[in-house]
Amino acid sequence: MTVHPPLALEAPPERLPGEPDRTRASGPTLYARLVLHALATALTGAVTAPLWPIFLASVLVWGWPPTAPAPAQIVRYLRLAVTATPPAPGLPVGVRAWIVVSVLKRAFTAPVFGLAWQLDELLYGRALDETPVVAPLFEVSAARSGSTQLARYLEEDPRLVAPSFLQASFPYLWLWRLAPATVGRFVTAEQVRHAIASRLPPEFLQRHEGDPFRTDTFEASLFMMHLNHLSPSLGPDVMIEDFSFAVIAPHNRQLWERTFVDLLDRVGRKTLRYAGPLPDGSPRRLFVKGHFLGACDAVAARFPDARFLAMARDPVARLQSAVNYIRANPIETSLGAPPWGWLGAALAENEASYCEVEQAWFSRADGPRRCVVRFADYVRDLEGTMRVVYRACFDEDAPPPTVPKTHPPRERTNYLLNRPLHLLGVDEAALSSRVRAYHEWCGA
């Protein structure tokens, strides 16, 4: 195993003048919120208790659903909440208690989300098994690489169909079919967009142009269904293991190589079935965007004719954006954001590892069909870049007319959170040295 020099500097200050207050809750505020959190969790446990016998019976028929955290992960996170010893500012008792309650609440909801998944198996299981997934396209790129914008362009190809953010978050075909005939009669798509945006902090909205009805990072829903989203609150060591998209820790192998692939497979078939064929009767092709590099071999084994597409971008710029983005992300809003130093240390290691694995995986001689486009080329020549993508992934010389050929004007944003790397606790010189080969490979 290669030992790399540390990429983290001393912990930076938690708040600078002019920054929004994202510091972790403490004192009376934390404990008041904790009491409410515990009461809500106890109520959730009481309400869902009668569902457990039905849920466990369904597990005997269809197996453990990918929408519910595995018992082993629940036990692990309860143990970590008590025993984890991250660096300063550490884990106060109130924060540990908050994490314990959050884990229990997620465990108590397992029958709800699990039975919602199993209902699809009861109603549509055979039809889904018979739904073909032919030559799917998977865009697998590092976070903050420009991959979401590229995915939105590809979505304009009517032959492709991608699960939207809402579909990935609520992956139940029966619900997709029920919603338009019920809630959809009274609530418009624009009202849904506004309702979701109003719950997100402005510093997050500045960095992520989300649309619940369009494609987004697919595995984000996996993290929220399970417990990985809590890892940043447990310190950098836990985050390095459980918030990594490239290097799979031994205890996460089942999650990524089996649970994730099953989720991807089933949601893909549901998406194809829900969308239906093209007007001429020809089938659509599945398209999924994410960062699931560590699972690519397992995905390729499930879909041998798949195409894999990556956007390669300067990792230093990506990391600076990623740390600010995660700090702004309302993962546990009432608890507050993880400390800057933890985020910088964990994401620097994960970013460097991602670069190493991505370069190796997309460069090796064997494996599935792959295509890499450089961010610099993508920005400078979108039309030429899309031609490269379509030749490699579609065996066509050019995309259809519906796919954009030029970038729309982009407004520059004065970010509310926009720290440089040295104020994120990251040693930029050490990072640049470690990713030098990748930097040359991606043409940054």
Map each language-model feature to its residues.
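Conserved phosphate-donor/acceptor-positioning beta-strand/loop module used by diverse small-molecule
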Residues: 299-324
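PAPS-dependent sulfation machinery
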Residues: 169-286
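Phosphate-binding P-loop
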Residues: 128-134
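Post-Walker A helix-loop "phosphate-sensing" segment adjacent to the P-loop in P-loop NTPases
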Residues: 157-166
